[in-house]
């Protein structure tokens, strides 16, 4: 079993974008930003424990950080790992349920 401290560090937060919203409405899928070294098993365990829902599957991808310039200095944004978490039928996770 994965320890509780690690599970809290795996999920960084929900990813809110047009594509993520469309996935949530149509496919019962929630998109999270996760730790770059998190595994699919850790992500599944963290979502099931923290939100008390059943997860069907997890797909992950890493987006490379953009190169940015400020004057003569050049830097690079950090890479971000995203997790598309597909919930089982009948399960629901609503982050903005109380907002009106």
UniProtKB/Swiss-Prot annotation:
Q: Taxonomic classification, please? A: Bacteria, Pseudomonadati, Pseudomonadota, Gammaproteobacteria, Vibrionales
A single GO molecular function term of this UniProt record: structural constituent of ribosome
Query: Which Gene Ontology terms of cellular component type are present?
Result: ribonucleoprotein complex; ribosome
Similarity section:
Belongs to the universal ribosomal protein uL23 family.
The alphabetical list of record keywords is: Ribonucleoprotein, Ribosomal protein, RNA-binding, rRNA-binding
Q: Say if the entry is tagged with keyword Nucleus.
A: no
An example Pfam family from this entry, by short name, is Ribosomal_L23
Gene3D superfamilies hit by this protein: 3.30.70.330
Write the protein's name.
Large ribosomal subunit protein uL23
Q: What does this protein do?
A: One of the early assembly proteins it binds 23S rRNA. One of the proteins that surrounds the polypeptide exit tunnel on the outside of the ribosome. Forms the main docking site for trigger factor binding to the ribosome.
Query: Where are its TM segments located?
Result: none
Q: Can you supply a Gene Ontology BP term from the record?
A: translation
The record, for InterPro entries, names: Nucleotide-bd_a/b_plait_sf, Ribosomal_uL23-like, Ribosomal_uL23/eL15/eS24_sf
- Species of origin reads Aliivibrio fischeri (strain ATCC 700601 / ES114)
Q: How does it assemble?
A: Part of the 50S ribosomal subunit. Contacts protein L29, and trigger factor when it is bound to the ribosome.
Indicate the secretion signal residues. none
């Amino acid at each position: 079993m994965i320890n509780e401290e690690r599970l809290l560090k795996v999920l960084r937060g929900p990813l809110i974008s047009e594509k993520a919203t469309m996935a949530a409405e149509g496919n019962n899928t929630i998109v999270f930003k996760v730790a770059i070294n998190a595994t699919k098993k850790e992500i599944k365990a963290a979502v099931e424990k923290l939100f008390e829902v059943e997860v069907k599957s997890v797909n992950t991808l890493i987006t490379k950080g953009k190169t940015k310039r400020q004057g003569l200095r050049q830097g690079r944004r950090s890479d971000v790992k995203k997790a598309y978490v597909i919930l089982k039928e009948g399960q629901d996770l609503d982050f903005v349920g109380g907002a009106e």
